[in-house]
A protein has these predicted regions:
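Short, amphipathic alpha-helical interaction segments embedded in low-complexity terminal/linker regions
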Residues: 79, 84-177
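Glycine-rich phosphate-binding loops that contact phosphosugars or nucleotide phosphates
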Residues: 1-75, 84-88
Length: 177
């Protein structure tokens, strides 16, 4: 854990000592810190750089934080992970394109994503996924651009792994021809 990381601490009460200590250790290592709590003005929230306080009120069964508090925390974590995936270039539109097709289930998902983005059929999806060694973003870029694997990888690297930016660059390049 270091300056390029973010540590998220989760506690319904916001007073779990080990979570507070984990955030303190993360701060000592120059990591950003986030608290997800279900209580106002908690010690954990005070420790974090960013505090997300999701006030859910008392549980239906007292002390059973897996119900309202846990459900609310799960929703917040889903939002944080989704936003992170978008910011990291793993998403194109509403599709999780940063997918390595390493088994049958993922291969089928990669084919569907490829077809949705390119408009090509599943046979072409298989062909390009084979050429890209299962890398969905690379397969899409190869199909759309006509680039070989190395040129497509270079184009993707030049756009920091963002498929959308790489596709825009290709379209812009072709407009100028």
């Amino acid at each position: 854990i270091g300056a390029n990381d973010t540590v998220v601490g989760i506690s319904a009460s916001g007073s779990a000592r080990f979570v507070i200590e984990a955030l303190q250790e993360a701060k000592d290592r120059n990591a950003a810190t986030v608290a997800v709590v279900n209580a106002s003005n908690s010690p954990l929230a005070a420790e974090a750089d960013v505090s997300i306080e999701v006030i859910t009120g008392p549980e239906v069964i007292s002390g059973s934080t897996r119900m309202k508090a846990g459900t609310a925390q799960k929703l917040v974590l889903n939002m944080l992970s989704t936003a992170s995936m978008i910011k990291m270039g793993k998403v194109y539109g509403n599709l999780m394109v940063d997918l390595k097709a390493t088994n049958r289930k993922l291969r089928a998902r990669a084919r569907r994503i490829f077809c949705a983005v390119t408009g090509e059929n599943e046979t072409e999806a298989e062909r390009f996924l084979d050429l890209a060694e299962g890398d969905t973003k690379l397969a899409i870029l190869m199909a759309v651009s006509g680039y070989d694997r190395q040129a497509a990888q270079s184009a993707l690297d030049g756009c920091n792994g963002f498929l959308g930016k790489a596709l825009q660059a290709i379209h812009k390049e072709r407009e100028c021809e």
